[in-house]
């Protein structure tokens, strides 16, 4: 089983995440930010990952620390659970519509952290979630997980729909990239390491 459990504590947050890449063994999300919980649930459900998130943060200050630090720990969990990445597909992509919105996510589990994020999020706040932090979350996941991530909203009107489509697309693209392919011998890189 490819799993990881990581706890990260700072003066601002304490985040514990358990991730199971191979079995959707249950999804339990508790960040104190309702919309963010909904997005992480959609990410795990459509990525078919087992995911438990317990995030305690300084929400009285701002949700930014909790959201970004959750991204850091989630990325670290992917990195740890993947190990040496032998036999994985490595690349994954997904287009996900949500009503009038269409999002795309493309990943390369290359060992190199990079983010290209292109989404016009016109509504600045959804419940307790500052929408500008969406990009910070995606960057935190990609950089801590050490992978390339290109995430974009091709079009849409409703900010909730745009962000939800992005989270679902990220889940589906990572599902494709972490999949074991019996035809892949060893590490999927000409360098021999990722």
Curated annotation (Swiss-Prot):
InterPro entries from the UniProt entry:
IGPD_sf, ImidazoleglycerolP_deHydtase, ImidazoleglycerP_deHydtase_CS, Ribosomal_Su5_D2-typ_SF
Q: What residues form the membrane-spanning segments? A: none
This entry's Gene Ontology molecular function terms read:
imidazoleglycerol-phosphate dehydratase activity
- Short name of any one Pfam family annotated for the protein: IGPD
Instruction: State the UniProt keywords alphabetically.
Output: Amino-acid biosynthesis, Cytoplasm, Histidine biosynthesis, Lyase
Please indicate which superkingdom the organism of origin belongs to.
Answer: Bacteria
Output the GO biological process annotations, alphabetical, semicolon-separated: L-histidine biosynthetic process
The Gene Ontology CC terms held by the record are:
cytoplasm
Cellular compartment(s): Cytoplasm
Q: What class of enzyme is it?
A: lyase
Q: Mind telling me which PROSITE patterns this protein's record contains?
A: IGP_DEHYDRATASE_1, IGP_DEHYDRATASE_2
Describe the reaction catalysed, as an equation.
D-erythro-1-(imidazol-4-yl)glycerol 3-phosphate = 3-(imidazol-4-yl)-2-oxopropyl phosphate + H2O
EC number(s) per entry: 4.2.1.19
Q: Which PANTHER family match?
A: IMIDAZOLEGLYCEROL-PHOSPHATE DEHYDRATASE, IMIDAZOLEGLYCEROL-PHOSPHATE DEHYDRATASE HIS7
Family designation: Belongs to the imidazoleglycerol-phosphate dehydratase family.
* Protein name (record): Imidazoleglycerol-phosphate dehydratase
**Organism of this sequence:** Lacticaseibacillus casei (strain BL23)
């Amino acid at each position: 089983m490819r799993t990881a459990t990581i706890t990260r504590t700072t003066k601002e947050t304490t985040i514990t995440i358990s991730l199971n890449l191979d079995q959707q063994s249950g999804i339990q999300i508790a960040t104190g930010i309702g919309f963010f919980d909904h997005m992480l649930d959609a990410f795990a459900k459509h990525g078919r990952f087992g995911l438990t998130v317990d995030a305690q943060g300084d929400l009285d200050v701002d949700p930014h620390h909790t959201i970004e630090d959750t991204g850091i720990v989630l990325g670290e969990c992917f990195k740890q659970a993947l190990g040496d990445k032998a036999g994985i597909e490595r690349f994954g992509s997904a287009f996900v519509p949500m009503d009038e919105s269409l999002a795309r996510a493309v990943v390369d589990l290359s060992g190199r952290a990079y983010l290209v994020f292109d989404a016009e999020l016109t509504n600045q706040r959804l419940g307790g979630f500052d929408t500008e932090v969406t990009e910070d979350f995606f960057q935190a996941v990609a950089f801590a997980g050490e992978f390339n991530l290109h995430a974009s909203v091709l079009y849409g009107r409703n900010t909730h729909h745009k962000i939800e489509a992005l989270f679902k697309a990220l889940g589906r693209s990572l599902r494709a990239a972490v999949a074991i392919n019996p035809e892949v011998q060893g590490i999927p890189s000409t360098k021999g390491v990722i």
